[in-house]
Amino acid sequence: MIKVAPSLLSADFSCLASEIRKVQKAGADLLHVDVMDGHFVPNITIGPVVVKYMRGVTKLPLDVHLMIKNPEKYIDAFVASGSDMITVHIEAIANAKLKTQSAKLRKKGIKFGVSLNPATPLSKIKPILKYVDFVLVMSVNPGFGGQSFIPGALPKIKQLRAIFKGDIAVDGGINDLTAKKVIKAGANVLAAGSYIFKAKDTKKAIERIRNAR
């Protein structure tokens, strides 16, 4: 089953609640929330307080993507704010700490995922795959929305699908054309920002991604 996760980085933050309700009504399966610290990536976005208010306006699962250094220091705060899913970057956390967080979060019923940047080889996450519920493959260099899809993500997705049975999510440059390619490669969760939030018809944009073949 293909799931569509509107990426709130591309939403209008002056009316975030209505933006969330709009994509929820249009058929979103979950919401992708990018958290950036200005260190791991150059941009700065939001913290646990904003996630808490997001939780108050939707029942959709919140996938909080921590693009931050030392994510283990902040995971508890984001869980307390109402996150349903937590994603950390393999480049930002040691394997031992990742395993510890995995055990903690799974006990709480929180889904735990790992993400890898375009330049990071798949071999980097192979030792920890059994500790995560999903993998997020970045198809742009993280930090800003509206970037173009990096085709090098496709063989990585295909190789990952051959060894991993959990959800494979893709984030970056997703539209109706790139959606076809990543789904064919083996991805089943697609995070899309600009394509959804800038569309004249939000529902049709989500449907085009979900039904891309």
Spans of model-derived segments:
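Conserved N-terminal beta1-alpha1 strand-loop-helix module at the mouth
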Residues: M1-T87, A92-K99, R106-K107, F112, ...
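Acidic, divalent-metal-coordinating active-site segment for phosphoryl/phosphodiester hydrolysis
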Residues: I174-A185
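Short glycine-rich anion-binding loops that position phosphate/pyrophosphate groups of nucleotides
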Residues: V140-P142
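Acidic, Mg2+-coordinating phosphoryl-transfer loop and its flanking beta/alpha structural elements
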Residues: A187-A192, F197-K198
